[in-house]
Swiss-Prot record:
Annotated cofactor note: Binds 1 [4Fe-4S] cluster per subunit. The cluster is chelated by three Cys residues, the fourth Fe has a free coordination site that may bind a sulfur atom transferred from the persulfide of IscS.
Species annotation: Dinoroseobacter shibae (strain DSM 16493 / NCIMB 14021 / DFL 12)
Gene3D superfamilies: HUPs
GO biological process per UniProt: tRNA thio-modification
UniProt pathway annotation: tRNA modification
Name of the gene this protein is made from: ttcA
Matches recorded under CDD domains: TtcA-like (cd24138)
Named cofactor requirement(s): Mg(2+); [4Fe-4S] cluster
Name of the featured protein: tRNA-cytidine(32) 2-sulfurtransferase
Keywords, ordered alphabetically: 4Fe-4S, ATP-binding, Cytoplasm, Iron, Iron-sulfur, Magnesium, Metal-binding, Nucleotide-binding, RNA-binding, Transferase, tRNA processing, tRNA-binding
One annotated Gene Ontology cellular component of this protein: cytoplasm
Length: 287
C-alpha cells in the first residue's frame, strides 16, 4: 500500500531502496499504532466531522518525520483530520526564516508561520550560565496554544519520540523522585486543547534516517547557543551505553512503561494495600 506511485510531494525524493521502504513502513505503522492505542482521533472525527490538528514544525528531523507520517496517513484516507503545520520563529539569531515557509509552499502543506521574539525575553530573564530550554519551552508552548485556538484546532501535536519519552522518565526517576514521563496524549491546563505525541513509539534513530533519506532542510536546534541541560545529556549517554552493550534495551525499557503493575509498586494512591485481602492475592487479574 505504501509503495503506490500516487504519493504526497513530501515523499517525492524517497529512495527506492528496500531499506528505506522498510523504514517508511515501520514509522507509518508505529504512528498509526500510537494514534489508535491512545485514542488520539477525537470522537467527532469518528462521527464524520474532521477535527483540525496543529502540527508543530521546528525544522528538526523529528518534526519533519511527524509531519510526513501524518500527511501520509491523511493522504491515503487513514486519518480523518485536517492538518495545519505551524512554525514559531522565536527570534533566535541566525534562524533561517525563509526555509520552512518555502519548503511548505513547495510541498503544498497548509501552514502558518508566526514570529514572536521570545528569545529576547529568555536572554533577559535567565541568569548567565543557566540553560535557556525550560523558559523557552514554556513561552513557545503558550504561543502554540494561542495559535491553535485562533486557528480552530482541537489539538497541538509535538514531535517527541520514544527516546525523548525514555529520557524524561529517567530524569524524573533520578532527579525528581517520581515515576513519570511525557504522555502520548494529555489535556492542557486550561482544558480546551489536546496535546498529542504520535511519534511516541518511533525510535529517534529512525527519525534521523528518515529525514536524511528524504533530504529535508534541517534547521539546527542550538541556534540560541544553549543545549539541553547536563542532566538530560547524562541520561542520554547512559541509555546509549546500555543500548551499545545490549542491543534492543531501549525497546525493552519502553515496553515496561506500557506494562505497569500498581500492586507491585509502593504507591498507596494507586493500589489499596490496606484493603487487600487474601482472596485478592490469588485473583486471576491482579492489578
Amino acid at each position: 500500500m505504501l509503495d503506490d506511485a500516487d504519493i504526497h510531494p513530501l515523499f517525492h525524493n524517497a529512495p527506492g531502496t528496500t531499506e528505506f521502504k522498510k523504514l517508511r513502513k515501520r514509522i507509518i505503522r508505529n504512528v498509526r499504532e500510537a494514534i489508535d492505542l491512545y485514542g488520539m482521533v477525537e470522537r467527532e472525527a469518528r462521527e464524520g466531522t474532521k477535527p483540525r490538528w496543529l502540527v508543530c514544525l521546528s525544522g528538526g528531523k523529528d518534526s519533519y518525520t511527524l509531519l510526513a507520517a501524518l500527511t501520509e496517513l491523511q493522504w491515503r484516507g487513514l486519518l480523518p483530520v485536517e492538518i495545519l503545520a505551524c512554525n514559531l520563529d522565536q527570534g533566535q539569531p541566525g534562524f533561517p526564516a525563509t526555509v520552512l515557509p518555502e519548503f511548505l509552499e513547495r510541498m503544498g502543506v497548509p501552514h502558518r508561520i508566526e514570529y514572536q521574539d521570545t528569545y529576547s525575553i529568555v536572554m533577559d530573564k535567565v541568569p548567565a550560565g543557566r540553560t535557556y530550554c525550560a523558559l523557552c519551552s514554556r513561552l513557545r508552548r503558550g504561543n502554540l496554544y494561542r495559535i491553535a485556538r485562533e486557528e480552530g484546532c482541537s489539538a497541538v501535536l509535538l514531535g517527541h519520540h520514544r527516546d525523548d519519552i525514555l529520557e524524561t522518565f529517567f530524569m524524573n526517576l533520578f532527579h525528581g523522585g517520581r515515576l513519570a514521563t511525557m504522555p502520548p496524549k494529555l489535556v492542557n491546563e486550561e482544558g480546551d486543547l489536546f496535546v498529542l505525541r504520535p511519534l511516541a513509539h518511533v525510535a529517534e534513530a529512525d527519525c534521523a534516517r528518515f529525514a536524511k533519506a528524504l533530504d529535508y532542510p534541517i534547521i539546527p536546534c542550538d541556534l540560541c547557543g544553549s543545549q539541553d541541560g547536563l542532566q538530560r545529556q547524562q541520561v542520554k549517554a547512559l541509555l546509549d551505553g546500555w543500548e551499545a552493550n545490549s542491543p534492543g534495551r531501549r525497546q525493552v525499557m519502553f515496553k515496561a512503561l506500557t506494562n505497569i503493575r500498581p500492586s507491585h509498586m509502593l504507591d498507596p494512591n494507586l493500589f489499596d494495600f490496606a484493603g487487600l485481602g487474601l482472596a485478592d492475592a490469588f485473583s486471576e487479574n491482579p492489578k
